C-alpha cells in the first residue's frame, strides 16, 4: 500500500532523524546514569535533567506536540503524516517524552483540547502542552478485567 506523506511530514522526518542522532541517542547513557543515581538515592521518580535539557531544545526547534491533529500551539498534522514521526520517535525509550508525545499525555491532551472548557484547558491542557506536568489515565469497573478502555461496559 503506498501512502504519500505531505511535504511537512517528510521534512519533519528528516529533522527528527537528525535530532535523534544529535541529541537523543547520545543522551540515553546519561539518562540511564541519572536514573541509576536517583534509584540509589531512594528517589527514582524524578525527571532526569538530561530530559529537561533536551525538551527545551526540541521545543526551540519546533519538534514539540506534533501528535495533535488540531494543535492549539501550532500547526496541525494528520494521523497519516504523524505515523512515520511516531515510528522514528519509537526508536528511543526517551524520545517521546523529549518531544512531548508520551502516552497517556497525548490522548489526554487530545481529549482536553476537544472537550474541556476554558477553565479546564487553562488548568490542565496548557501545562501539559508546555511539558510542565504529566497526566494519568485510570479506569475501573466491576466485572471488567482489562486496562483496555474499549472494554468498558458502563454507559
Q: At which residue positions do the language-model features occur?
A:
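Amphipathic, small/basic residue-rich leader segments at the start of a protein or domain
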Residues: 1-100, 119-127, 134
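A generic signature of intrinsically disordered, low-complexity regions enriched in glycine/proline
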Residues: 69, 85, 109-112, 152
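N-terminal glycine-rich flavin-associated loop
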Residues: 99-119, 148
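Glycine-rich, Trp-frequent "lid" loop and neighboring beta-strands that shape
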Residues: 75, 115-155
